[in-house]
């Protein structure tokens, strides 16, 4: 059994900014500059669909696996010596279109998670194929579960059944529902006894929808460790595993959690 208290601290950077609508190259240039401002960190988190904005034009915008954004992320991760993650529109090997989070490591390996819950109010379920499985990544011994935007509303999918240390959400969450974002994120940390980090965008997209940001990091009691508000920029925070280990030892509610199976 691993000793969570002995894990090193984890320094993460949240990149909250505007997105150029359907302009991959402009977004590459913008994010390359912002990633350079993060300094020495372990993990850099970008918004959902960070190369295009939240778009249903998957037919024209989807890029292949190992396409330009895979290559760009590999280069940026190597340059920053950090994991870089965010979601993009991908055409999978089976031809389906996915809202796919890419997890680019500095050694060149890329892992991924496909968004499970597609936002039907925008017709996302008509243009994309949902993911079939939960995913957990490891970084410096930390167990990290990635999720994308609308996934936040479904607590069973976020449920920590694998001793997750950090729930990581990347999003294009509109300002009209910012109250829900700010209420649900601390709930996920409290119910799962883990840290939560969430990145949203700011500005207005090509369809006229406004985004309020509110990127944030919360601890296992739902307490705020970082809040970006509506600002555009790069925000860093250090997570301490020893604090999480101590809290779980004092309040092991996870031992009484109900068992379940996902179908």
Question: For each predicted feature, which ranges?
Answer:
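N-terminal glycine-/serine-/threonine-rich phosphate-binding loop
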Residues: 1-43
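Beta-strand-turn-beta hairpins that frame and shape the catalytic cleft
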Residues: 2-12, 136-145, 166
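Cys-nucleophile CN-hydrolase/nitrilase-fold catalytic domain and related Cys-dependent amidase chemistry
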Residues: 24, 32-109, 174-188, 194
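Short hydrophobic-aromatic micro-motifs
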Residues: 44-45, 143-148, 168-170, 197
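Short beta->alpha transition motifs characteristic of CBS
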Residues: 52, 102, 113-119, 216, ...
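CN hydrolase (nitrilase-like) catalytic-core segments centered on the catalytic cysteine
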Residues: 68-85, 153-235
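Short beta-strand scaffold segments in enzyme catalytic cores
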Residues: 86-88, 100-103, 135-137, 215-217, ...
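Active-site catalytic loop in hydrolytic enzyme cores
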Residues: 92-162, 176-183, 246-253, 263
């Amino acid at each position: 059994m691993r000793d969570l208290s002995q894990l090193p601290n984890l320094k993460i950077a949240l990149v909250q900014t505007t997105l150029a609508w359907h302009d991959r190259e402009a977004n590459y240039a913008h994010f390359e500059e912002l990633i350079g401002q993060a300094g020495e960190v372990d993990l850099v988190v970008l918004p959902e669909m960070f190369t295009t904005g939240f778009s249903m034009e998957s037919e024209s915008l989807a890029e292949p696996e190992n396409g330009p954004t895979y290559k760009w992320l590999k280069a940026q991760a190597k340059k920053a010596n950090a994991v870089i993650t965010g979601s993009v529109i991908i055409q999978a090997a089976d031809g389906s279109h996915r809202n796919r989070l890419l997890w680019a490591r500095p050694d060149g390996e890329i892992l991924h998670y496909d968004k499970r819950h597609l936002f039907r109010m925008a017709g996302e379920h008509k243009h994309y194929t949902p993911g079939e499985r939960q995913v957990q990544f490891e970084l410096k011994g930390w167990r990290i579960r990635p999720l994308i935007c609308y996934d936040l509303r479904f607590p069973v999918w976020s449920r920590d059944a694998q001793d997750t240390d950090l729930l990581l959400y990347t999003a294009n969450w509109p300002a009209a529902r910012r109250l829900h974002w700010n209420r649900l994120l601390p709930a996920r940390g409290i119910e799962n006894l883990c840290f939560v980090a969430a990145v949203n965008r700011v500005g207005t997209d090509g369809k006229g929808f406004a985004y309020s940001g509110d990127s944030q990091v919360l601890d296992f009691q739902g307490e705020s460790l970082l809040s970006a508000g509506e600002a555009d920029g790069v925000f860093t925070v250090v997570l301490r595993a020893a604090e999480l280990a101590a809290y779980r030892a004092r309040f092991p509610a996870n031992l009484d959690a109900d068992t379940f199976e996902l179908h």
